[in-house]
From Swiss-Prot:
<feature type="region of interest" description="Disordered">
    <location>
        <begin position="1"/>
        <end position="27"/>
    </location>
</feature>
<feature type="compositionally biased region" description="Basic residues">
    <location>
        <begin position="1"/>
        <end position="22"/>
    </location>
</feature>
<dbReference type="GO" id="GO:0006412">
    <property type="term" value="P:translation"/>
</dbReference>
<keyword id="KW-0687">Ribonucleoprotein</keyword>
<dbReference type="GO" id="GO:0015934">
    <property type="term" value="C:large ribosomal subunit"/>
</dbReference>
<dbReference type="InterPro" id="IPR044957">
    <property type="entry name" value="Ribosomal_bL32_bact"/>
</dbReference>
<dbReference type="InterPro" id="IPR011332">
    <property type="entry name" value="Ribosomal_zn-bd"/>
</dbReference>
<dbReference type="GO" id="GO:0003735">
    <property type="term" value="F:structural constituent of ribosome"/>
</dbReference>
<dbReference type="Pfam" id="PF01783">
    <property type="entry name" value="Ribosomal_L32p"/>
</dbReference>
<protein>
    <recommendedName>
        <fullName>Large ribosomal subunit protein bL32</fullName>
    </recommendedName>
</protein>
<dbReference type="InterPro" id="IPR002677">
    <property type="entry name" value="Ribosomal_bL32"/>
</dbReference>
<keyword id="KW-0689">Ribosomal protein</keyword>
<comment type="similarity">
    <text>Belongs to the bacterial ribosomal protein bL32 family.</text>
</comment>
Amino acid sequence: MAVPKKKTSKSRRDMRRSHHALKPSAYGECPNCGELKRPHHVCTSCGHYDGREVVSEDVAA
């Protein structure tokens, strides 16, 4: 069974974990209605994506 030869220092452990932090979600403005929306997602308020209406407005709202 594999066993560590030396104790991992706090510095090495923390450097390894430096990429584990949560990043804030990215949001952009919908060009159709101006509401905030996630990139590469259909706008939840107006149902538009890439300049086209993909979801009808009564379903989106």
